[in-house]
Amino acid sequence: NLLQGTEYFPDLNDSILFLEDDEVSKSVDFDRDLQSLIHQPSFTGVRGFVIGRFQKTSNMTDEMLANIIASKKELSNLPIIANVDFGHTSPMITFPIGGTAHLRAKKDNSLLKILKH
């Protein structure tokens, strides 16, 4: 969030955003940060989200995260995969920045495929 409103904030057009938070972040912090991101001018270009698994100390539950996502009408038609092992958790997957990917998010059939990096 520190780059929002600056010349260093990236263009979000045609992007899949990878979001994660640290152990001190609580559900209200994530909710506020997500809403702030939604208000960015290029947010309409976002094509999907991959949300990292929250650390246990954050007390974020699957139900809380689902409620936060459901409360954002701007997310209703976007594919979203949550509880992915990257960021501040272990095990940790490393994803390339940039490149091309395909994201499909269905209840029991989700896929993130890195096509080019």
Protein language model annotation of sequence segments:
Residues 40-45, 74:
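Short, conserved loop/helix-junction motifs that constitute active-site signature segments
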Residues 5-8, 38-40, 91:
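Short, flexible, glycine/charge-rich loop motifs used to bind or transfer phosphoryl groups or to couple energy/partner
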Residues 53-117:
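ATP/nucleoside-binding phosphotransfer catalytic cores, i.e., glycine-rich phosphate-binding loops
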Residues 15-17, 47-48, 78-81:
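Structural motif
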Residues 28-42, 65:
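A short, acidic, amphipathic alpha-helical segment used as a generic capping/interface helix at domain edges
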Residues 1-34:
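ATP/pyrophosphate-binding catalytic subdomain of soluble kinases
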